[in-house]
């Protein structure tokens, strides 16, 4: 008998215990437009039926010279339409790209502009928004992060301590938001 072929995209192992079930997807260089090319991603997201979806994109788009704010708005809108089409009801938290540098010396102004546009988009679509530019207190924070040994020498990517700090700050923001909600 000939065996059929199949594709295994992922596997979820869980039990009946309370707690967080965490899923992650992403590849270095991924952009909003990469996800919208693959409807199956949204089908699988709907099957998981998450309570919270955290979207952290925008850095890669900000390094494309021909990619502007209008392109970002279009790509975010297409992404959102795919979510709506599948009636995905989980809360969405959009995070902005962090401050970064181009060629190790110039502020990535597009990342700053994208951060603003993402905040506007999140507000218009009732998504929560976490602005890494505001958390950093300035668009030129990357050299400080580098001097603090939190980012790599390219002044775009973080190293483990930097990612850990970002995670800690995000977790604190989530808990603070939840505490405010409970009050």
Where does each model-flagged region fall?
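A generic secondary-structure signal
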Residues: 43-44, 82, 173
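Conserved SGNH/GDSL esterase-like catalytic core that processes O-acyl groups on lipids
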Residues: 1-74, 157
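Well-ordered alpha-helical segments embedded in enzymatic catalytic cores
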Residues: 40, 75-79, 169
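Catalytic His-Asp segment of secreted/periplasmic serine-dependent ester chemistry enzymes
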Residues: 99-183
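Hydrophobic positions in alpha-helices of CheY-like receiver
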Residues: 79-83, 122
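Loop/turn elements at helix/coil->beta-strand transitions in domains of secreted/extracellular proteins
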Residues: 18-21, 48-53, 87-92, 124-128
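Active-site segments of SGNH/GDSL-like serine hydrolases
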Residues: 54-61, 82-115
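Charged helix-capping and loop-helix junction motifs
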Residues: 70-78, 110-114
């Amino acid at each position: 008998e000939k065996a059929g072929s199949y594709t295994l995209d992922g596997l979820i192992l869980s039990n009946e215990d309370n707690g967080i079930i965490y899923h992650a997807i992403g590849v270095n260089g991924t952009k909003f437009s990469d996800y919208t090319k693959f409807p199956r991603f949204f089908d699988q997201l709907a099957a998981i039926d998450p309570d919270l979806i955290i979207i952290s994109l925008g850095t890669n788009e900000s390094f494309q010279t021909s990619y502007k704010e209008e392109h970002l708005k279009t790509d975010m809108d297409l992404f959102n339409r795919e979510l709506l089409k599948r009636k995905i009801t989980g809360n969405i938290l959009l995070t902005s790209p962090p401050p970064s540098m181009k060629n190790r010396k110039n502020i990535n102004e597009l990342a700053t502009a994208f951060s603003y546009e993402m905040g506007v988009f999140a507000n218009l679509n009732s998504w929560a928004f976490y602005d890494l530019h505001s958390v950093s207190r300035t668009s030129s924070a990357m050299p400080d992060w580098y001097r603090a040994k939190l980012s790599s020498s390219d002044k775009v990517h973080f190293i483990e301590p930097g990612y850990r700090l970002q995670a800690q700050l995000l977790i604190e923001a989530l808990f603070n938001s939840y505490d405010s909600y409970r009050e």
